[in-house]
Curated annotation (Swiss-Prot):
Protein name per Swiss-Prot or TrEMBL: Germin-like protein subfamily 3 member 1
Keywords attached to this entry: Apoplast, Disulfide bond, Glycoprotein, Manganese, Metal-binding, Secreted, Signal
Organism name: Arabidopsis thaliana
Disulfide bond annotation, renumbered to this chain: C23-C38
Chief location bin: secreted
Gene it is expressed from: GLP1
The protein's assembly and partners: May not form oligomer.
Tissue spec. comment: Expressed during germination, and also in green shoots, etiolated seedlings and whole seedlings.
UniProt keyword annotation of Plastid present: no
Domain Cupin type-1: 52-198
Cellular compartments annotated: Secreted, Extracellular space, Apoplast
Residues noted as binding Mn(2+) in the record, renumbered to the chain: H100, H102, E107, H146
Additional detail: Is the most highly expressed of the GLP genes.
Length: 208
């Protein structure tokens, strides 16, 4: 009996792509917590398993001088159900991917061009920082605050891969200053003065 229960629990934990060979996303249907519904295998094409978008640099003309080009199931249907996602990072000079977390996934960063200083902070507040060159890889454990900064004078780029179809994203600065949390509460919980908080809210579009 216990063996049967164990086997059933494993089956329920499997994704569609584990039960089947693959589950190419049907983008005409709504996404669910388990991903997109599968299109029928007879309609699957080789191009469903190919994504070309990571070969084009993103637009870095913005406040962080950086761009993220995602390759999730919505852009790359062949990834659906595989528990993977990927993206391209482009960092102009002085570009930064601010402190952020991915609650649902660990991340691997592979530097393509330029020089990138990257790091993360552990739950014990230990800091791990490294300047990476092309061909080097760094891993960021699930849920930990981490960042990437262009460490050179020219543009830099990288590819990141996640062990989840939905890694989630929360940017620390946006969480604090790009919402309607009252200034006095931000002051009380961050030890910043009200002038600084209001300035940051103004820059990031927050209110309160």
């Amino acid at each position: 009996m216990l063996r049967t229960i164990f086997l059933l629990s494993l089956l329920f934990a499997l994704s569609n792509a584990s039960v089947q060979d693959f589950c190419v996303a049907n983008l005409k249907r709504a996404e669910t917590p388990a991903g997109y519904p599968c299109i029928r295998p007879i309609h699957v094409k080789a191009t469903d398993f190919v994504f070309s978008g990571l070969g084009t640099p993103g637009n870095t003309t913005n406040i962080i001088n950086a761009a993220v080009t995602p390759a999730f199931a919505a852009q790359f249907p062949g990834l659906n159900g595989l528990g993977l996602s990927t993206a391209r990072l482009d960092l102009a000079p002085k570009g930064v991917i601010p402190m952020h977390t991915h609650p649902g996934a660990s991340e691997v960063l592979f530097v393509l061009t330029g020089s990138i200083t990257a790091g993360f902070v552990s739950s014990a507040n230990a800091v791990y920082v490294q300047t990476l060159k092309p061909g080097q890889v760094m891993v960021f454990p699930q849920g930990l605050l981490h960042f990437q900064i262009n460490a050179g004078k020219s543009s830099a780029s990288a590819v990141v891969t996640f062990n989840s179809a939905n890694p989630g994203l929360q940017i620390l600065d946006f969480a604090l200053f790009a919402n309607s949390l009252p200034t006095e509460l931000v002051v009380g919980t961050t030890f910043l003065d009200a002038t600084t908080v209001k300035k940051l809210k103004g820059v990031l579009g927050g209110t309160g």
